[in-house]
């Protein structure tokens, strides 16, 4: 695996997480996700394992950047050791990034199909739903949250946040 690719994917995940809080982050997120799909498409010669870990790197960059506040809660408020607090944030980020990685495998498995964008969006929404329900019930950092001022804000009251997420992923494809 190329180290530069992993660094690029991690930084891209961090950028997407950082744009979520901007006033028009939903608009900025779509081209950044398009760049991510393009970058992952370049990895077509990777094995499934390498592809999984490449997309896991993106997810870790995304969640570590978005869950920085857990460090403050654990260390400053809870009194946990700084090293243990950092490790806890990285471990939680790695766990929830697994759902992104599994969803991104659909790009590798169906890259030549004309419905790969729909399959990616469907698997992404399924991954987000499972992330919200299984074990942790961790609903934070979903892509629908960025659509408050984004292009799909009007969809949320009628179809919900997962429909917004589906449209974000599909349009960025």
Where are these regions (language model features)?
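Membrane-embedded alpha-helical bundles of multi-pass enzymes
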Residues: 1-173
């Amino acid at each position: 695996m190329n180290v530069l690719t992993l660094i690029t994917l991690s930084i891209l995940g961090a950028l997407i997480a950082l744009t979520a809080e901007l006033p028009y982050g939903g608009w900025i997120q779509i081209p950044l996700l398009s760049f991510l799909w393009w970058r992952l498409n370049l990895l077509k010669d990777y094995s499934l394992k390498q592809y999984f870990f490449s997309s896991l790197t993106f997810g870790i960059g995304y969640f570590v950047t978005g869950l920085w506040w857990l460090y403050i809660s654990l260390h400053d408020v809870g009194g946990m050791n700084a090293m243990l607090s950092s490790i806890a944030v990285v471990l939680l980020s790695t766990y929830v990034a697994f759902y992104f990685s599994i969803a991104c495998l659909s790009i590798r498995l169906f890259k030549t199909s004309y419905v790969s964008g729909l399959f990616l969006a469907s698997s992404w929404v399924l991954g987000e739903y499972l992330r919200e329900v299984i074990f942790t019930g961790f609903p934070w950092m979903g892509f629908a949250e960025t659509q408050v001022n984004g292009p799909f804000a009007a969809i949320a009251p009628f179809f919900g946040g997962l429909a917004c997420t589906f449209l974000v992923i599909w349009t960025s494809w």
